[in-house]
Amino acid sequence: TERSLKKMFKYLFINQKNYPAVLKANILKKKSKIKNLNVETIKVSHGTMQTIGFKINKFAYIPDFKKIEKTELKKLKNLDVLIIDCFRYRPHNTHVNFDECLEYIKLINPKRAYLTNMYHEMDYFKLKTKIKNKNILPCYDGLKIKI
């Protein structure tokens, strides 16, 4: 991810003649402690690119992904809250679709799950009626989640 970002957005990381660098890459360890938070990175596949999600205590945020390996899934047990990619209804090569998203939620089995990163065809109210579990909800702008 770092290599890809630096290649695509070189000007943000390296001083240019008329443009100073504005970002510095901070590489996270697999496990970190920030104050009273245990932060763990979760490796996921986003098409051919590897990206990461985050587990923070009993909360996880996994936005852009197509596949989570079994070893990484094990790290996501006993979650209170999961925010997970749910791009669209039809299959996509770099994101999980609705059915795949629900399968991952079933495997991870969090107390509550929120769907994010939704394509414009994912109407909030229609999506809510398609979800048969009251502990799974689509995200919306301005949503506040108590963790």
Kindly label every feature range from the protein language model:
Residues 1-62, 66, 128-147:
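Binuclear metal-dependent hydrolase catalytic cores
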Residues 69-81, 86-147:
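Binuclear metal-ion centers of metallo-dependent hydrolases, dominated by the metallo-beta-lactamase
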